[in-house]
């Protein structure tokens, strides 16, 4: 196969993942309001796609237009391919919302009322709502030499209003801009009595369209057109000019709201001359214009399921399983000292991790606590426990990653609070994101210091721990806990990388470990021995790993990859990858765990990791891979993390050589296997 065809386009692969998410919104087996949520997830993902990936392609085209990307194409060619795929996905999304979801919701008494369908009583209520809630806070900006075109915030809802007449100062009118503040809901619930006892919603854009004339008394409104600008959201911090990383991040967060435009969304009814006017204002081309049949921001519909009390239209509630042994002992440290604990979230509760930190804060025998924070949410019992530990006089060190995309402001806030509580807060190593998920507790026991560590595949975030699937290990293993201590010393101090006993770390040893393990399986296959690699991750795009997997496949290694999102490897290509199979599982839970398995002539080497197989994870982040050696825990990771995922024939998608996906289905006579439901049955409370 030609060199340029061995690697698929990562952006097209990411859009293909979102097509699989959209399939959840189409699936009649998914509860109706959850289908609406999946529709919103696609919109949110697309926003980030344009803010990050499309923005990167545009920058790359400007910087080096002739350079070929990993997929063998130049940036301009890739932009054209990606734009076509994005348009197709967005059209499909709006068709689904308008022609399928809205009618089905209406049958359940959940209505989105358009202006043409408002009853007189609804019109009266909506006008009162506008006068009471909107009119006092809206600020129209008329465009003239003293009022230049305003800079809309990233992803904000705006309206271009065409006017006729002269204002109070005798100025001829032409156009004004109205910006809808973000504090306003994008969908407004109507009183039940106005909706026949059901649930009714109106779009904020419809309310503004109906009453925008009140912002321009005495003027004639000729047209009102919603638009939304998506901007490049990359944060750039110059190391040479850097004095204070936290202050620099705070400044960049403000600037990000006004980055270069990458996408303009308008309704499909917007006239051509308005579209051209807006494109000119934002220095965009027609290729960057997206006309949609409906509201320009479907993301904000995610409020609707929470406003509708219909359990029959939502997923059933699951209760995470709890460690029975934890209730029988006074201390989690006593339990871990006996044997390590493996947690599989969300099927098993995240509470033991929280309890470990709470106990560390209150236990007089605990001398020091260390933890990394990448994403943790706006409310975190874990961070509160760290603050309590610091206030209690313990040595608390927290590595806060300020560059966690779209969580920067939240992490800056936590860093301030932790410092005020007396914790030592460091921001990692400039140029390397700290993505490793690790915590360390140092305790004095019988006159000697004893370490306890938690290492996970997911964030210290109680909210996502109920949605994302992840593994976590709590251990007192002396070599592993010593390794974790070395990693914290590397991050917070200065010096050469320490020699680790069991852990592997990026950017120093993890990539080499993966390449070496693949090569070892390759040699075993050449020698006629059984050889197998099974791995689960979010993304696989690192070219040298892909080439190593191709070599392994050619040697006869059987390779099964469970890749939820981007995968730029081509599976099943004769002479290249016929022994590689790739599947993606998309369901209620977000598959997030990273698990690596290498047969190794029967030793079954198994790791849990924070790292996907991407260049950034191997070379530009601080990551960990932890071996699972305890026989029972290894058996669980292989079975729950890999085997059950390979058996799934309900939510699995099978990747094809061209990068497309086909949904798996039970073979004739085969029973259904549903990874996530089966894990709830196996592990849930």
UniProtKB/Swiss-Prot annotation:
EC number per UniProt: 2.7.4.1
Post-translational modification: An intermediate of this reaction is the autophosphorylated ppk in which a phosphate is covalently linked to a histidine residue through a N-P bond.
Requisite cofactors: Mg(2+)
UniProt keyword Ligase present: no
Residues noted as binding Mg(2+) in the record, renumbered to the chain: 375, 405
GO molecular function: ATP binding; metal ion binding; polyphosphate kinase activity
Gene Ontology terms: cellular component: membrane; polyphosphate kinase complex
Reaction(s) catalysed by this chain's protein: [phosphate](n) + ATP = [phosphate](n+1) + ADP
Entry's Gene Ontology BP terms: polyphosphate biosynthetic process
Keyword 4Fe-4S recorded: no
Cited CDD domains: PLDc_PaPPK1_C1_like, PLDc_PaPPK1_C2_like
Enzyme class: transferase
Protein family per UniProt: Belongs to the polyphosphate kinase 1 (PPK1) family.
HAMAP family: Polyphosphate_kinase (MF_00347)
Name the UniProt record assigns to this protein: Polyphosphate kinase
Organism of derivation: Neisseria meningitidis serogroup B (strain ATCC BAA-335 / MC58)
């Amino acid at each position: 196969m030609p060199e340029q065809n061995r690697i698929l386009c990562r952006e097209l692969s990411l859009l293909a993942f979102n097509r699989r998410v959209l399939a959840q919104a189409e699936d009649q087996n998914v509860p109706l309001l959850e289908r609406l949520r999946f529709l919103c997830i696609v919109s949110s993902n697309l926003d980030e796609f344009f803010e990050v990936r499309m923005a990167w392609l545009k920058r790359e085209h400007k910087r080096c237009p002739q350079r070929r990307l990993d997929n063998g194409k130049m940036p301009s060619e890739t932009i054209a391919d990606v734009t076509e795929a994005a348009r197709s996905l967005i059209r499909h999304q709006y068709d689904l919302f308008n022609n399928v979801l809205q009618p089905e919701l209406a049958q359940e008494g959940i209505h989105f009322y358009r202006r043409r369908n408002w009853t007189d009583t609804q019109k009266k209520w909506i006008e009162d709502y506008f006068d009471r809630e909107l009119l006092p806070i809206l600020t129209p900006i008329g465009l003239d030499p003293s009022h230049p075109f305003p800079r809309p915030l990233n992803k904000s809802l705006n309206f271009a209003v065409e006017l006729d007449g002269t204002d109070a100062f005798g100025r001829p009118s032409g156009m004004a801009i109205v910006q809808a503040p973000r504090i306003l809901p994008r969908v407004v619930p109507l009183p039940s009595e106005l909706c026949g006892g059901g649930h009714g919603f109106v779009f904020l854009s419809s309310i503004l369209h109906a009453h925008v004339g009140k912002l321009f008394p005495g003027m004639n409104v000729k047209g009102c057109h919603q638009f939304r600008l998506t901007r490049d959201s990359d944060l750039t911090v110059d190391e040479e000019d850097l004095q204070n990383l936290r202050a620099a991040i705070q400044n960049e967060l403000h600037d990000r709201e006004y980055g270069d435009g990458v996408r303009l969304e308008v309704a499909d009814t917007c006239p051509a001359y308005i579209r051209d006017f807006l494109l000119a204002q934002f220095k965009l081309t027609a290729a960057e214009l997206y006309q949609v049949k409906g509201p320009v921001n479907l993301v904000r519909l995610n409020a609707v399921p929470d406003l509708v009390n219909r359990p029959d239209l939502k997923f059933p509630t699951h209760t995470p399983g709890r460690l029975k042994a934890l209730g029988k002992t006074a201390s989690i440290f006593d339990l871990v000292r006996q044997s390590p604990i493996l947690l599989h979230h969300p099927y098993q509760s995240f509470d033991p991790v929280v309890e470990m930190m709470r106990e560390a804060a209150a236990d007089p025998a605990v001398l020091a606590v260390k933890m990394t924070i990448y994403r943790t949410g706006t409310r975190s019992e874990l961070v509160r426990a760290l603050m309590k530990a610091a206030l209690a006089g313990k040595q608390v060190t927290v590595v806060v990653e300020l560059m966690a995309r779209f969580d920067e402001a939240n992490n800056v806030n936590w860093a301030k609070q932790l410092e005020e509580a007396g914790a030592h807060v460091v921001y990692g190593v400039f140029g390397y994101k700290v993505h490793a998920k690790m915590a360390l507790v140092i305790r004095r026991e019988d006159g000697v210091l004893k370490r306890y560590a938690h290492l996970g595949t997911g964030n210290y975030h109680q909210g996502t721990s109920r949605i994302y699937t992840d593994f976590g290990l709590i251990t007192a293993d002396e070599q592993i806990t010593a390794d974790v201590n070395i990693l914290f010393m590397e991050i917070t101090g200065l010096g050469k990388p320490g020699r680790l006993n069991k852990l592997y770390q990026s950017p120093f040893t993890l990539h080499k470990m993966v390449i070496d393990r693949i090569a070892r399986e390759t040699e075993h296959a050449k020698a006629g021995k059984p050889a197998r690699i099974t791995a689960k991750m979010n993304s696989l795009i690192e070219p040298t790993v892909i080439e190593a997997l191709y070599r392994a496949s050619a040697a006869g290694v059987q390779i099964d990859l469970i890749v939820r999102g981007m995968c730029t490897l081509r599976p099943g290509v004769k002479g290249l990858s016929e022994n590689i199979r790739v599947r993606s599982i998309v369901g209620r839970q977000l598959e997030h765990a990273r698990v690596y398995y290498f047969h190794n002539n029967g030793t079954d080497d198994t790791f849990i990791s924070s790292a996907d197989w991407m260049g950034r994870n191997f070379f530009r982040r601080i990551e960990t891979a932890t071996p699972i050696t305890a026989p029972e825990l290894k058996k669980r990771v292989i079975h729950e993390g890999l085997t059950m995922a390979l058996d799934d024939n309900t939510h699995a998608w099978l990747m094809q050589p061209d990068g497309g996906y086909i949904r798996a289905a039970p073979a004739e006579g085969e029973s259904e296997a549903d990874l996530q439901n089966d894990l709830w049955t196996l592990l849930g409370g």
